Amino acid sequence: MTVRPSALDPAIASRLRRNDAGLFPAIAQQHDTGEVLMLGWMDDEALHRTLTTGRATYWSRSRGEYWVKGDTSGHQQWVRSVALDCDGDAVLVRVDQIGPACHTGTRNCFVADPLPTRVGDPGVTADAGPAR
């Protein structure tokens, strides 16, 4: 596993579960509406920068460098809160998104390619028909 040097609080770092590249997913969510905006990747240092600067910072897997959301596009993410999930293998970054979150220009990264989905019904089970 690749773990780059970081100033992240060791108490936080010890709770993180990372992949073999030393990364974990970071879900960006609009703080006031709950809209899921995007998924990025962080390592310990990206999380440290996010927690201490108030700007969402990610690790670019393709470029191999840190990037602060909005530094190039102007579509900034101002951090409102960060939460670690129950397994320690993902973080939820609640932000105030300025402009589109997606590099394609859409508000979020999940609008371009909806998949065909059978919609579930909590009152119906797959095998037995309607629940009683």
UniProtKB/Swiss-Prot annotation:
The set of disulfide-linked cysteines is none
Q: Report the pathway entry.
A: Amino-acid biosynthesis; L-histidine biosynthesis; L-histidine from 5-phospho-alpha-D-ribose 1-diphosphate: step 3/9
Query: Which Gene Ontology biological process is one annotated for this entry?
Result: L-histidine biosynthetic process
Q: Does the keyword Cytoplasm apply?
A: yes
Cofactor mode of binding and number, as noted: Binds 1 Mg(2+) ion per subunit.
Q: Which reaction does it catalyse?
A: 1-(5-phospho-beta-D-ribosyl)-5'-AMP + H2O = 1-(5-phospho-beta-D-ribosyl)-5-[(5-phospho-beta-D-ribosylamino)methylideneamino]imidazole-4-carboxamide
Q: Where in the cell is it found?
A: Cytoplasm
- Keyword Cytoplasm attached: yes
HAMAP family found in the cross-reference section: HisI
Q: What PANTHER family would the database entry show?
A: HISTIDINE BIOSYNTHESIS BIFUNCTIONAL PROTEIN, PHOSPHORIBOSYL-AMP CYCLOHYDROLASE
On assembly, the entry states: Homodimer.
Q: What is this protein called?
A: Phosphoribosyl-AMP cyclohydrolase
